[in-house]
A protein has these predicted regions:
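Catalytic alpha/beta core domains of metabolic enzymes, predominantly
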Residues: 98-237
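Catalytic beta/alpha-barrel core
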Residues: 2-4, 20-33, 53-55, 70-101, ...
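Cofactor- and metal-binding active-site motifs of prokaryotic enzymes
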Residues: 50, 55-77, 184-197, 202-209
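Acidic (Asp/Glu)-rich catalytic clusters
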Residues: 31-47, 75-88, 104-113, 139-141
Length: 237
């Protein structure tokens, strides 16, 4: 279960009045309040692991936070989680590697028994293979327990390159790797577990059956289960 704190903050503050959350104070105050709702959601999920994310505008979210503000937010988040019972904490927190705070956050999270997902997003294109491999290596060096990349393809060749990078990284890195090519063109990468991607993201319909993807190209969870069953890969629980 993925919970994006900054998306919850947007809803709490009111989308019409605050189309882009830019005040760090408003964000942090609301995050601390929202965490109590996250704890309740985790309890209601009956043992389903919770991944906590704080996705800003640069990573496809809505909040406008600079690197310093992002680091402060993550420190506050972990300080708050320290007061929770270990069994109620999220199993992992997602940190954008380009923010520069991954080593600090990874060390603090490790003390709390919370895993760290190192993330890299590129909504403009698919970097060269060597650049993607360096990003994955950096996540490992800086303490990530899982290295995840999401990129935008301009062609089928870009998708194929990403799958190749994924396969090589999965075979050589000491931590699991997750990689996805966004948009309709990259959908195959979200269900092609045979190339080594350790996890994928799927959309769960709301009570009215409506589907709202958090990133372009995400598929409904039932379709993802069906694809994983056909193509190989452990179905989502």
């Amino acid at each position: 279960l993925r919970v994006d704190l900054l998306e919850e903050v947007r809803r709490a503050l009111g989308e019409e009045r605050h189309p882009r959350v830019s005040s760090l104070r408003a964000v942090t105050d609301c995050v601390l309040e929202t965490l109590t709702q996250v704890e309740a959601a985790a309890a209601a999920a009956s043992g389903v692991p919770v991944l906590l994310t704080c996705r800003t505008a640069a990573e496809g979210g809505r909040a406008s936070l600079g690197d310093a503000g992002y680091a402060v937010l993550m420190r506050l988040l972990l300080d708050e989680l320290a007061s929770w019972e270990p069994r109620r904490r999220p199993v992992a927190v997602d940190i954008e590697v380009r923010r520069g705070c991954l080593p600090e956050v990874a060390a603090r999270a490790r003390d709390l028994g919370v895993d760290v997902v190192g993330s890299f997003h590129d909504f403009e294109g698919t970097p060269a293979d060597a650049d993607l491999e360096e990003v994955l290596d950096r996540m490992v060096r800086e303490g990530g327990d899982l290295a995840k990349i999401a990129v935008w393809p301009a062609s089928a060749e870009d998708v194929a390159r990403l799958l190749g990078v994924t396969a090589r990284a999965a075979a050589s890195l000491p931590v699991p790797v997750a990689a996805m090519s966004m948009g309709a063109l990259g959908m195959i990468s979200r269900v092609a577990a045979v190339f080594g991607s350790a996890l994928t993201f799927a959309v769960v319909p709301d009570e009215e059956g409506c589907i709202e993807a958090s990133a372009p190209g995400q598929l409904p969870i039932d379709e993802v289960r069906r694809c994983l069953s056909l193509l190989g890969g452990r179905p989502i629980g």
